[in-house]
Amino acid sequence: MNKDHEEQLEINEVSQKNKYKSIIESLLFMSGEPINIKDLATILNCKQDKVSSLLNEMKNSYVGKDRGIKILIHNRAVQLVTKPENSIYVEKLLKTNIRQSLSQAALETLSIIAYKQPITRVAIDEIRGVKSDRAIYTLLEKNIIKECGRLDVPGKPILYGTTEEFLKFFGLDSIEAIPNLEDLLKEFSKEEN
């Protein structure tokens, strides 16, 4: 094998490696959750050892740089996370964006839960007149509501209530600090007339 051919193989190998790293980074970014190394290997159609090696190279490339993210590898799963020293700024962003990131359905559902808690999904659906599964899922994911028990009836449906995060996000000291529903309804009807 001549020297030019060896150099070409090396260039191709580096190019393939960089392509894999790019794909892995995209997958980690879009997932937002830990991804099993085995799943990454399946997606990339390569061996788990190769994925582990690529991940370690990527992890090392983030260390010591002025980057806001790092790769976290734990129990054969990997996740792209923000660096702890930036957490104060990330929290500020999340607090300002929470209201913007909630759909109308999620805001309606959250209002019902805040005023009627603890409440079941079926009761929420009856008040809204439509299914609320997706809105409830979104609110649970954002840790704005929580499961706070089960109703003691056949089927034992889950009861939902607000969390401490709900209070923080809306700047409330306690759940009692939310405006009285009757007062809001009176104010709303005055504005319409």
Curated annotation (Swiss-Prot):
Keyword terms of this UniProt record: Cell cycle, Cell division, Chromosome partition, Cytoplasm
Compartments (UniProt record): Cytoplasm
Organism: Clostridium botulinum (strain Kyoto / Type A2)
The keyword Cytoplasm is annotated on this UniProt entry: yes
Family the entry assigns: Belongs to the ScpB family.
InterPro entries according to UniProt: ScpB_csome_segregation, WH-like_DNA-bd_sf, WH_DNA-bd_sf
BP terms from Gene Ontology: cell division; chromosome separation; DNA replication
Record carries keyword Cell division: yes
PANTHER family recorded: SEGREGATION AND CONDENSATION PROTEIN B
Primary subcellular site in the record, as a coarse category: cytoplasm
HAMAP family registered for this protein in UniProt: ScpB
Family annotation (NCBIfam families): SMC-Scp complex subunit ScpB
Protein role: Participates in chromosomal partition during cell division. May act via the formation of a condensin-like complex containing Smc and ScpA that pull DNA away from mid-cell into both cell halves.
Protein name: Segregation and condensation protein B
Subunit field text: Homodimer. Homodimerization may be required to stabilize the binding of ScpA to the Smc head domains. Component of a cohesin-like complex composed of ScpA, ScpB and the Smc homodimer, in which ScpA and ScpB bind to the head domain of Smc. The presence of the three proteins is required for the association of the complex with DNA.
Single GO cellular component term: cytoplasm
